[in-house]
Amino acid sequence: MALRLGQLGSGPWWRAVRGDYAQLRAPSPRSASACVCRLPGTAGTQPRRGLGHGSSAGGGSRLGTGLAAALAGMAGLAAAVLGHVQRAEMVPKSSGARSPSPGRLEEDGDELARRCSTFMSSPVTELRELGRRPDDMKTKMELMIMETQAQVCRALAQVDGVADFSVDRWERKEGGGGITCVLQDGRVFEKAGVNISVVHGNLSEEAANQMRSRGKALKKKDGKLPFTAMGISSVIHPKNPYAPTMHFNYRYFEVEEADGKMHWWFGGGCDLTPTYLNREDAVHFHRTLKEACDQHGPDIYPKFKKWCDDYFFIAHRGERRGIGGIFFDDLDSPSKEEAFRFVKTCAEAVVPSYVPIVKKHCDDSYTPQDKLWQQLRRGRYVEFNLVYDRGTKFGLFTPGSRIESILMSLPLTARWEYMHSPPENSKEAEILEVLRHPKDWVH
């Protein structure tokens, strides 16, 4: 099923938000997993099948119980529960500081329909439910990540010009589901995945114990801890060795105690992994993220930049995965609305921070030696994701997890050579120096 974004307005879910809810039906497993969304400017291209397309793609993820099941499809959400090694904080800005507008979601059904018409798929939550609670943070976050997914996919498809994003919609029997969009074997991108997950249920005992170990002594009701988790996660691997890989992830989590007390927090980040160092690109990427952070306080970028450098560290290699960006977790201050506005601002910075860099380098000439070095660096990327990334490890060791979406972050190709070491003063050695000793790119 090939769709243009502009044609989504004729679908049944579009009619539903205008009041005809009886016509709203969940897509069949086959049609959902086979969907290919063609974006403006890509007419006439051949549809390509993405990851997660198979017998288990559309019929539910068959997940286990608790949080492990809930994470099905976005490993980054596991880090939101199990990876709180630090607590992110934002201090309220002075009254003289510029404050972004709240961006309140309009309750009018036509406005919601107009906004949803640009998405890659209908939202995971029923539109009637979203319309009933426009001011709820779960609604705001779900619509924001759906919007971000569409914006990123549209921008990447326009850059590639050949390949389409497959749209793989999956459901979770315990509650919620997700939308995995993958473009692979394109002209510019070897593999680009943009995944959304919106899940809810009860925390597993393991997850509850992890929270208690971090000082969150949550009280169960009848042995259960209800939770909601949602987020967007993306990894983009271009073909050209001079175009860097980029990753971003933004998520929201709620847990309700027995007495009705609600705990909530945000997490996420955005980072760049170049094969070869281009200082102009590094400055552009970090400056764009800094400008986004600075809208919410002058001390945020330095703190989250260091956190990123520390987190994406391959200890057995003594290297960072890339040149960093920002990373934060357990963000629950100064208020839910301000924290959301910060996350939204960061999500809006994804396209302007990265797409100009890809456009600049996607047609650069390169040698077989350049490609070889790219494959070796991709090997490092795989090592970090499989050995250190908390969300990936948790998902892989959890029975019933949706493996296709968890491994979406891995490149199509990578390489390992025994005792490989680049020559001194080479451009390969230059990037290694930066990976071993992180730099300040904006001062």
Swiss-Prot record:
Identify the catalytic residues.
H247 (proton donor)
Alphabetical list of InterPro entries matching this protein = Coprogen_oxidase_aer, Coprogen_oxidase_aer_sf, Coprogen_oxidase_CS
Write the signal peptide boundaries. none
Keywords tagged on the record:
Acetylation, Heme biosynthesis, Mitochondrion, Oxidoreductase, Phosphoprotein, Porphyrin biosynthesis, Transit peptide
* Localization of this protein: Mitochondrion intermembrane space
- One GO MF term attached to the UniProt entry: identical protein binding
- What sections of the protein cross the membrane? none
The segment annotated Disordered runs over 90-111
> Where are the annotated segments for Important for dimerization?
182-191, 381-417
Query: Residue positions of the PTM N6-acetyllysine?
Result: K393
Transit peptide limits: 1-98
* Enzyme class name: oxidoreductase
Q: Quickly give the catalysed reaction.
A: coproporphyrinogen III + O2 + 2 H(+) = protoporphyrinogen IX + 2 CO2 + 2 H2O
Q: Which residues carry this modification: N6-succinyllysine?
A: K393
Which family does the entry's similarity section mention? Answer: Belongs to the aerobic coproporphyrinogen-III oxidase family.
The UniProt entry, under PANTHER family, shows: COPROPORPHYRINOGEN III OXIDASE, MITOCHONDRIAL (PTHR10755), OXYGEN-DEPENDENT COPROPORPHYRINOGEN-III OXIDASE, MITOCHONDRIAL (PTHR10755:SF0)
Fill in the subunit field for this protein. Answer: Homodimer.
Protein name per the record: Oxygen-dependent coproporphyrinogen-III oxidase, mitochondrial
